[in-house]
Swiss-Prot record:
Cofactor annotation comment: Binds 1 divalent metal cation per subunit.
InterPro entries, A to Z: SurE (IPR030048), SurE-like_Pase/nucleotidase (IPR002828), SurE-like_sf (IPR036523)
A cellular component annotation (GO) from this entry: cytoplasm
Molecular functions per Gene Ontology: 3'-nucleotidase activity; 5'-nucleotidase activity; exopolyphosphatase activity; metal ion binding; nucleotide binding
Domain of life of the native organism: Bacteria
Role according to the record: Nucleotidase that shows phosphatase activity on nucleoside 5'-monophosphates.
Organism in which the protein naturally occurs: Zymomonas mobilis subsp. mobilis (strain ATCC 31821 / ZM4 / CP4)
Localization of this protein: Cytoplasm
Annotated a divalent metal cation binding sites: 8-9, 40, 93
Reactions catalysed according to its record: a ribonucleoside 5'-phosphate + H2O = a ribonucleoside + phosphate
Protein name: 5'-nucleotidase SurE
Amino acid sequence: MRILITNDDGIAAQGIKILEEIAHKISDDVTVVAPDKERSGMAHSLTLSLPSRLYKHDDRHYSVSGTPSDSVVMGIKEIMKDNPPDLVLSGINHGANLAEDVTYSGTVSAAMEGAIAGIRSIGLSQVYSPDFKNGALSFDTAVSWGEKVIRQLIDSTLPNRTFYNVNFPACENDDVKGIRVVAQGHRDYGRLNVEKGVDPRGKDWYWLALGEAISKDNLNGDLDLSYQNYVTVTPLAPNLTDVASLQPLTDILAK
């Protein structure tokens, strides 16, 4: 099995190194193609108005001066074009990708790009909690559960255009309750904040910052189950159609 690994935290990030170690337990044919620096929050963006640079670190490690989706495209269309990957793994993200996080996430969108190409694809994230080990991000649950989850999803009979969003809970490994397949949850709007300051030349600057929002998650959604110390797996698809609204909207526009 040929595995392509990417992320949105950059090729030097701890999470992608851990994911590579996990991948090598599954296959000895692993190639890493990741952004040359952190590209968090890039969603499914592509670099179309500028050239991209490809940096070869060795035969198995490459970095791209672009987005996570750029990296997947570069891996499939250039680096592995003669032997395309059978599996795309994206992560392990430094922090959760739960609920509406998936719409901003470069990690999840890189997995989406793989799915669009018809390749089995999985995005993986380690949930971060400020209360966990004095704010330190531990990948212990990802290390312990990652291989098992990936192997099970590889064997999935769902179409390859279905991809998976996996989140490992922020708890001690012994406290993980198991794996749950869940729907995408919901966060109340307000997690994004705008920080304002003044630069040395007296001009205003603005910085978007992620905070915590009080959330009334749907029961048994990914937020809810992650908070309960489950490894959550959510099947996603590139098709964003709100199927339940098709007929009501048809009725409205037919008037």
